[in-house]
Amino acid sequence: MSGHSKWATIKRKKAATDQKRGNLFTKLVKEITIAAKMGGGDPTGNPRLRLAIDTARSNSMPMDNIQRAIKKGTGELDGVSWDEITYEGYGPAGIALIIETATDNRNRTVADLRHIMSRNNGSLGESGSVAWMFQRKGSLDVPHSAVSEEQLMELLLDAGLEDLDQDDENYFTVITDIKDLESAKKALDEAGIAYENAKIDLIPDNYIELDADDAAKVMKLIDALESNDDVQAVYSNMELSESAMNSLSE
């Protein structure tokens, strides 16, 4: 899963920029609202809401904002009704893309996405065109400074660990089945081991390695997509060559 690890490294380095962009809280509020609408406002019985709240809190969202988003989802406060729509397509160098959106206007969203893709050497595809290349998994990152590889594997083998990616120089990436992500988090919490970026992820079965030039083009497209307020997440099967990794890390 080296491609996943390198991509996760770039995503972590982008996180500060993404937050400054100003639309991070908008995306988090949408996710909380949708999760509360679908599964109720009690996070103890709603894993998706619990994960959304944890993500919001890790990004310093005030509890008042979180509670308002929950109440909008449960109908206690008036709010926008969001439709979740997933789009698929291809970017530069044939990279597969899955784009998850939450929108109150489907026509606007698809028009915006087509415009962004066409301006960045990409194109939208039909439903199912690339989804078969990905698996939905749980993932989280554990700093090397918090635990050894042996300790981490021993701790999580009975908590749903499927794969442990060690390619990142600072983090282990833990991969689980979706249903086991909460068990992995609980095991780490009980052991007092810090972790970051716990989430449901789309992980490709195979990666396409890109050189620095193509990687920069794909990153430009992904940045443009993620800047759109209707886009909640973008997934790709891009793997970074060492030259691309060094270039994007500068």
Curated annotation (Swiss-Prot):
InterPro entries: Integrase-like_N (IPR017856), TACO1_YebC-like_2nd/3rd_dom (IPR048300), TACO1_YebC_N (IPR049083), Transcrip_reg_TACO1-like (IPR002876), Transcrip_reg_TACO1-like_dom3 (IPR026564), YebC-like (IPR029072)
This protein's record includes keyword Plastid: no
Signal peptide as annotated in the record: none
Domain of life, per lineage: Bacteria
Subcellular location: Cytoplasm
Classification via Pfam families: TACO1_YebC_N, Transcrip_reg
Keywords from the named record: Cytoplasm, DNA-binding, Transcription, Transcription regulation
Any single GO CC term annotated in Swiss-Prot or TrEMBL for this entry: cytosol
GO molecular function: DNA binding
GO biological process, one term: regulation of DNA-templated transcription
NCBIfam families: PRK00110.1, PRK12378.1, YebC/PmpR family DNA-binding transcriptional regulator
Family recorded in the similarity comment: Belongs to the TACO1 family.
Cited PANTHER family: TRANSCRIPTIONAL REGULATORY PROTEIN YEBC-RELATED, TRANSLATIONAL ACTIVATOR OF CYTOCHROME C OXIDASE 1
Name of the protein: Probable transcriptional regulatory protein Cag_0165
Lineage of producing organism: Bacteria, Pseudomonadati, Chlorobiota, Chlorobiia, Chlorobiales
